[in-house]
From Swiss-Prot:
Pfam families: Peptidase_M32. This is Carboxypeptidase 1. The active site is at 266 (proton donor/acceptor). Binds 1 zinc ion per subunit. One of its GO terms (biological process) is proteolysis. It comes from Bacillus subtilis (strain 168). Its cofactor is Zn(2+). Zn(2+) binds at residues 265, 269, 295. Keywords: Carboxypeptidase, Hydrolase, Metal-binding, Metalloprotease, Protease, Zinc. A motif (I/NRXXA/SD) lies at residues 347-352. InterPro entries: Peptidase_M32_Taq. Residues 3-496 form the Peptidase M32 domain. Homodimer.
Length: 501
């Protein structure tokens, strides 16, 4: 048979996987945006079956045969086909090591655990979730033994989200970050030059917040012909296919920042997905390069655009019009200082730019302890609370504002959290390079012209999908290896100026 016949069959299998994945993504989206609770058990079974079907295709004998044949003629393949075959081989080898029945059991457990987590969070009762968490951890410990690792068991999980990143790499990066940020947080907390934020928590109608969320998505370049905005408990963006990338947010009438910045954050994720090269659609390359690269895009939009004074120069009046009494006597400068306030807080997704990395480092250190067998599930809440006291000087009073605040563990996503901090580092380095290429960056924000910024990010990051590894994307885009100093310098300069340190 000609090589292109094998290629076609290989890509047909990838296309079939993408169809199943779309159905699973739709059910996940539905379950988190108001699907009837009574259907959760059957829905979990459906998700489990479809996920097993995907697993079976990825680990089928035919997939292995096609990968082997294409590897024999590797030099004759196009660059994209080479990348797709390499990725399929990696996934095959990872998945083949997990027994099929065990994988299906795990997927069903994840779906049930998410439902249990939602109830536990609502009641602020860790004991309702801990039996599921115990099982999820045991599954992942078994997976680690199946996959193997070189230095640290946690490396096997980190590689799922951020290929090439290890405990050794993160320990070094996070040590440098902690050394710079913890003293800065203490200085900011002790500063007498704090912004007035009293107006932030005044009533801001939910409907007006929704209108603004829709407006900012449109302005920033999100394509509504290929997406929609919905409400959820824990905001996320999800991709059904390149033409259907959905965004969710959460409204709080006593704090408009939750919805506005949450929406802008998810907008960054969605714009990434909407601008991956169309040629990759239906393949395993039509996805973000890694969780960290994905997070770099959401944090870039949320922080480097959304919290920038130049962004609010043309748009502050929209906020004033939406809630006139609340903002009547508040100047633009006072507004910008208030939305950039830094103070230790319990909730990661609502943390300010300065303290945010510490929320991630806490989760990293706890997950590392879990998979080093240094902590039991029952001791996790107290370990969590102790680290918040040590790093941020505060202690959560309830499980909901402590260990139950994130959905990640319920979905089995151990090893995901470090990607948020890496994404922040990636974003700071990309911003530095963008300022060289687009010195008019601030002027573009003041004019509400986001296309050149989006275009730069698309060319350097979005279009490549999974063609490149995360660290290669950063090196190719910026001309140097990942450097944590860009983030440290950005935070030091910004908060020293804001708090007159």
């Amino acid at each position: 048979m000609e090589i292109h016949t094998y290629e076609k069959e290989f890509f047909d299998l990838l296309k079939r996987i993408s169809h199943y994945s779309e159905a699973v993504a739709l059910m996940h989206w539905d379950s988190r945006t108001g699907a009837p609770k009574n259907g959760s058990e059957d829905r979990a079974e459906s998700i489990g079956q479809l996920s097993t079907d995907i697993f079976n295709i990825q680990t089928s004998d035919r997939m292995k045969e096609l990968i082997d044949v294409l590897y024999e003629r590797f030099d004759d393949l196009s660059e994209d086909t080479k990348k797709a075959v390499e990725l399929a081989k990696k996934e095959y080898e990872e998945n083949k090591k997990i027994p099929e029945a065990e994988y299906k059991e795990y997927v069903i457990l994840c779906s049930k655990a998410e439902t249990a987590w939602e109830e536990a969070k609502g009641k602020s009762d860790f004991s309702l979730f801990s039996p599921y968490l115990e099982q999820l951890i045991e599954f992942n410990k078994r997976f680690i033994t199946y996959w193997g690792y070189q230095e640290h068991p946690y490396d096997a999980l980190l590689d799922l989200f951020e290929p090439g990143v290890t405990v050794k790499v993160l320990d070094q990066l996070f040590a440098e970050l902690k050394e710079a940020i913890i003293p800065l947080v203490k200085q900011v907390t002790a500063s007498g030059n704090k912004p007035d934020t009293s107006f932030i928590t005044k009533a801001f109608p939910k409907e007006k917040q929704k209108e603004l969320s829709l407006y900012f998505l449109q302005e920033l370049g999100y394509d509504f012909d290929g997406g929609r905005l919905d409400e959820t408990v824990h905001p996320f963006a999800t991709t059904l296919n390149r033409g259907d990338v959905r965004v969710t947010t959460r409204y709080d009438e006593k704090d408009f920042r939750t919805a506005i910045f949450g929406t802008i954050h998810e907008c960054g994720h969605a714009i990434y997905e909407q601008n991956i090269d169309e040629a990759l659609s239906g393949t395993n390359l039509s996805d973000g390069a890694s969780m960290g690269i994905h997070e770099s895009q959401s944090l870039f939009y949320e922080n480097f655009i959304g919290r920038n004074k130049h962004f609010w120069t043309p748009y502050y009046k929209k906020i004033q019009e939406a809630s006139p009494v609340q903002f009547k006597d508040i100047s633009l400068d006072d507004f910008v200082r208030a939305i950039n306030e830094s103070k230790p807080s319990f909730i990661r997704v609502e943390a300010d730019e300065l303290t945010y990395p510490l929320h991630i480092i806490i989760r990293y250190e706890i997950e590392k302890a879990i998979f080093s067998n240094e902590v039991s599930v029952e001791d996790l809440p107290s370990l969590w609370n102790q680290k918040y006291q040590d790093y941020l000087g505060i202690t959560p009073q309830t499980d909901a504002e402590g260990i139950l605040q994130d959905v990640h563990w319920a979905g089995g996503d151990f090893g995901y959290f470090p990607s948020y901090a890496l994404g922040y580092m990636y974003a700071a380095q990309l911003k530095q390079k963008m300022l060289e290429d687009l010195p008019e960056f601030d002027a573009l924000l003041e004019r509400g012209e986001f296309h050149p910024i989006k275009q730069w990010l698309t060319e350097k990051v979005h279009i490549h999908g999974k063609r490149k590894k995360p660290l290669d994307i950063i090196k190719d885009a910026t001309g140097e290896e990942l450097n944590v100093r860009y983030l440290i310098d950005y935070l030091s300069n910004k908060y020293s100026n804001l708090y007159l340190l």
